[in-house]
């Protein structure tokens, strides 16, 4: 008898720092992460976050979330030659044990982080995006909002990701309105996968 992995999909968003109907109109911008983290356990930090000259205060991020909250950080080829590589590496390092993964090619990871966090590196090609991934381990996925336009579509995405994942607790991130997360989470709990 083959034993299946027990799956509990953690749902999160591709970024939190944006205008979104989920946030109260009078919520200060600097409180968005804390507000988001009240209902979510993970966030994908997009590659654009690390560009623009000012490195984010990730120590403040850690203060805004609970100990169980996790950050998935994306880096791309733009970071390999960025003048602020050392500051980016320090900011990522400041996430400490709350850093769940660094999504980057080996070359970019090495250029920005050296050998730090090598065990957390996930190749971008290993991120599930709705189709089969030619990777030994699938623990992260991203789905665009237009793939979640009905309860049936949401169910199909959750089933496909659960089938593709190779770890007991994979993370699926939504690229779209934060309100979709609540609907997806409700359906996932009914299905027994979230």
Predicted features by range, described:
Residues 1-194:
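Residues lining hydrophobic/aromatic ligand-binding pockets adjacent to catalytic sites
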